[in-house]
Amino acid sequence: MIKKFLLASAASALVAGAASAADLPRRAEPPPVFTPVPVFTWTGFYAGTHTSYGITDNGAIITRGNNGPGAGPLIGPTNTNTVANVASGRRIGVFSTETDKIGKIGGGFGYNYQFTPGSGFVVGVEASWTWTDLTRGRSYVSPLNDVSTYRQSVDWLGLVTGRVGYAFDRVLVYGMGGFAYGNVFYDANFRGNGAGFPVAYAGRYSDLETGFAYGGGIEYAVPTDSFLNFLSVGRYLGIKSEAITLKAEYVRYDLGSRNVLVNSINPATGATFTAATGSYTSRFNTEGHLIRAGFNYKFGGF
C-alpha cells in the first residue's frame, strides 16, 4: 500500500514539474537584419573633362568709311573717299565669317546640392574651360579688283555658371546660365586693285572679352557596380570617386561686339598707285553655340 502511494506521489511531482516548465518564458529568435540600400544624391563636388562641337553665330562684319568729301582734316586733293568706297562696293559693307569645328577639349569642376536624396531639386555652381579654336578668314574682291580680307577667331572660352535642375534618381536634367569670357582676335586688311599693291589699310584687335552664356543639359550617374566604373581611368590613377557621371549639354555664348579701326598704313605715293588716306571702321561680333559631351568624377554623397 505504501509502495503504491509513493509511486503515485512521484508521478504527480513529475507531471507538475513538466507543467511548470511549459509555463516558463522562451528566448525569442532575433529579428532579421536588413541593410538599407543607400539612396543616391547629387550633393558633392565633382571634376571632369569634355569634348565639344562649336558653331559661330557672329553675324555680319559691318564696315563703314570714316572720310568723305568735305569731312575732316584729311580732305585734300589726294584724300581717299572711304565713305564712297563702301557705298560703291569697292569695300564691302556687310561680310560674314561663320565657321564650325569639332573635337576640341576642355574641363571643369563644380559643386551640387540636392535638397532631397533620390528625386528632387538640385542647385549648383560650375566653372569650365573649353579650347574652341574657332577661326575663319575670308576675302572679298570688288568689281574693281580691290581685295578686302577679314579674319576672326575665338581661341578659348571660359564659363562660370549657376545650375538649377531636377534629379530623377540618377538622371539629372538642368538649366544653366552665367558669366562667359574668352580670347578673341579680329583682323582686317584692305588692298588696292593693282598687281603687287601692298596693304593700304589694316586694323587688328586681340584681347580678353566678357559676356554671358546660358544653356542646359542632361547628366547620368553610372551605378557603382557598372563596368564603366571599373574601366575608369581615374580608378587606375588613384582617384577615388563615389560615382562617374556622363553628360551632354548645349551652351549659347555671347561675348559682345567690338569696333576695330582700319587705318591707312601706306602714306607714300608710287608710280602705279595713289597714297591711301583716311580710315574705315569694322565692327565684329562674337557669338556662338557649343555642344559638349563628357564625364565627371563625383566626390561626396553616395
Where are these regions (language model features)?
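Gram-negative outer-membrane beta-barrel domains
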Residues: 2-302
